[in-house]
A protein has these predicted regions:
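A conserved beta-strand-loop-helix scaffold within acyl/acetyltransferase catalytic domains
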Residues: 1-98, 115
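Short, contiguous acidic/charged loop-to-helix segments that flank catalytic cores in large enzymes
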Residues: 94-102, 128-133
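Conserved acetyl-CoA-binding loop-helix of GNAT-fold acetyltransferases
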Residues: 99-113
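Active-site/acyl-donor-binding loops of N-acyltransferases
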Residues: 119-160
Length: 160
């Protein structure tokens, strides 16, 4: 289904987006992120929930957790880093239910709408895996579904 249909479905299903700031919220989110990363890629997030909370506390105007909440439960969300002209999605995660009903789509749409007047662009980050060697086509398609475009980073190795 298209992004607009998924966003509408999430709303019909009772998903609401909240910007969360408590330690327990960051822990719940990173637990969800790690479940997804472990299941799909056998890796874990770079940050812990405690580290994300610390970053948020040190930079409250720049680090934000937008969570998709259904029946008082965090089912999806994104952590964004806000810069002068850019908003960067550092983490995005959704459980199975959230994927079915478009809960992450609603969170991303909320971020886009919040920043569209004040930022030049939204940086979805990389779409690669296995040491940044292989393109994750599903992740790339998700980002392109929001109007994102791909760019190529060249990787150079110098033997010194």
């Amino acid at each position: 289904k298209g992004r607009k249909a998924q966003i509408s479905r999430a709303k019909r299903e009772g998903v609401v987006i909240k910007e969360l700031t408590e330690l327990e919220d960051f822990k719940k989110f990173i637990d969800l992120e790690n479940e997804v990363l472990t299941e799909r890629h056998d890796v874990k997030a770079v940050h812990t929930g405690e580290e994300l909370k610390l970053l948020h506390d040190r930079f409250p105007e720049n680090i934000h957790l937008f969570a998709s909440i259904k029946d008082n439960k965090l089912i999806a969300g994104t952590v964004v880093y806000e810069y002068d002209h850019v908003v960067h999605t550092q983490y995005m995660a959704a459980n199975d239910e959230a994927r079915q009903i478009g809960a992450l789509d609603l969170a991303i749409s909320t971020v886009i709408n919040k920043y569209r007047e004040t930022k030049k662009w939204l940086d979805f980050g990389i779409s690669t895996e296995h040491g940044k060697i292989y393109l994750n086509e599903g992740l790339c398609a998700q980002k392109e579904g929001f109007g994102g475009r791909t760019g190529v980073y060249e990787i150079w190795e110098l033997n010194l």
